[in-house]
Structure formats: structure tokens, C-alpha cells
Regions:
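Bacterial N-terminal signal peptides
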Residues: 1-7
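N-terminal alpha-helical modules
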Residues: 10-106
Length: 106
């Protein structure tokens, strides 16, 4: 079992704040529990993954995460498109975590 304790950097991975919706895509995410769950999963995986990689790769992950809202927002209110965007963004983060679990740095 892997236990990860990490200080969390929220500047690049803040989840959607449903009290401060700024566009129709965020409104769609906030109105659909499965999309909110996808947002929370992506944010959590980002926070963990950035603590497990070297600085160069961390910067790449941060750049990708900062660009994500603009890509997601191109979906408008299309729930399937939004979910696909979250899955595409989350996949490399999951891969980082899986790689550490199977190969370690330990």
C-alpha cells in the first residue's frame, strides 16, 4: 500500500468553485455530480502527481493543468465532451501515480 503525504499546491489545480461560476461550462459541471467528481479527481491526481515528479516534468504538468480550463470550456454545455476532456487530462496524471506505485522511487 502506498501512502502519499504531500503539501498541496493549489495555484495550478484549483477545483471549480460553484459559488463563483464564470461560464456555461462551469455551470454545466456544477449541475452534474459526475462532472464535479471528475473535476475533483483530476485536481486530486494533479496535486499528488506534482509531488512525485522532478521539476521539469512538474512544470509540464502545471502548464497542462493551467491550459485545461480553456480546452474544457470549448465543450460549452456538452456533458459528454466535458467528461472526455476531464478523462484526457486525468490520464497522464494517473500514469505518473501508477508508475511510482509499480516502479517506485523507493
Amino acid at each position: 500500500m502506498l501512502v502519499v503525504c504531500a503539501s498541496i499546491s493549489v495555484h495550478a489545480a484549483s477545483p471549480i468553485n460553484c459559488a463563483k461560476i464564470t461560464n456555461e461550462t462551469e455551470r454545466t459541471v456544477c449541475g452534474k455530480p459526475s462532472l464535479l467528481q471528475a473535476d475533483a479527481r483530476m485536481t486530486t491526481y494533479f496535486e499528488i502527481a506534482t509531488q512525485l515528479v522532478a521539476m521539469g516534468q512538474r512544470g509540464d504538468l502545471q502548464d497542462s493543468q493551467q491550459a485545461f480550463p480553456a480546452l474544457r470550456n470549448k465543450c460549452g454545455t456538452d456533458k459528454a465532451c466535458i467528461l472526455a476532456a476531464y478523462k484526457k487530462q486525468t490520464a497522464p496524471l494517473e500514469a505518473v501515480i501508477a508508475n511510482v506505485v509499480t516502479h517506485g522511487p523507493f
